[in-house]
C-alpha cells in the first residue's frame, strides 16, 4: 500500500496568487480546516511546498 499524508488548509486563499489558488484546488482543498488524504508522491510534495504557508502536513 502506498504511503499517504494528510494535508489541512490553515489559511484562506483570498488575495493569493492565482497559481497558488490553482495549486490548492489541485490538492483538493476547498476551505480553511478542510483536510484531504493524498498519496505521497514527488508531484504532491512539490505542490505542498508551493503553498506551504497555507497548509499543514501530517505524515
UniProtKB/Swiss-Prot annotation:
Q: How does it assemble?
A: Part of the 50S ribosomal subunit.
The family classification in the record reads:
Belongs to the universal ribosomal protein uL30 family.
Gene of this entry = rpmD
Task: Identify the keywords attached in UniProt to this record, alphabetized.
Answer: Ribonucleoprotein, Ribosomal protein
UniProt xrefs under Pfam families: Ribosomal_L30
| A GO term for molecular function | structural constituent of ribosome
Note the superkingdom of the native organism: Bacteria
Q: Which Gene3D superfamilies match?
A: Ribosomal protein L30, ferredoxin-like fold domain (3.30.1390.20)
UniProt protein name: Large ribosomal subunit protein uL30
A GO term (biological process) for this protein?
A: translation
Gene Ontology, cellular component aspect = cytosolic large ribosomal subunit
Keyword Metal-binding included in the entry's annotation = no
Record's HAMAP family?
A: Ribosomal_uL30_B
Amino acid at each position: 500500500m502506498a504511503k499517504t499524508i494528510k494535508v489541512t488548509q490553515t489559511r484562506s486563499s483570498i488575495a493569493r496568487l492565482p497559481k497558488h489558488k490553482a495549486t490548492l484546488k489541485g490538492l483538493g482543498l476547498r476551505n480553511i480546516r478542510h483536510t484531504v488524504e493524498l498519496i505521497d508522491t514527488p508531484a504532491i510534495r512539490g505542490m505542498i511546498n508551493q503553498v506551504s504557508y497555507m497548509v499543514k502536513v501530517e505524515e
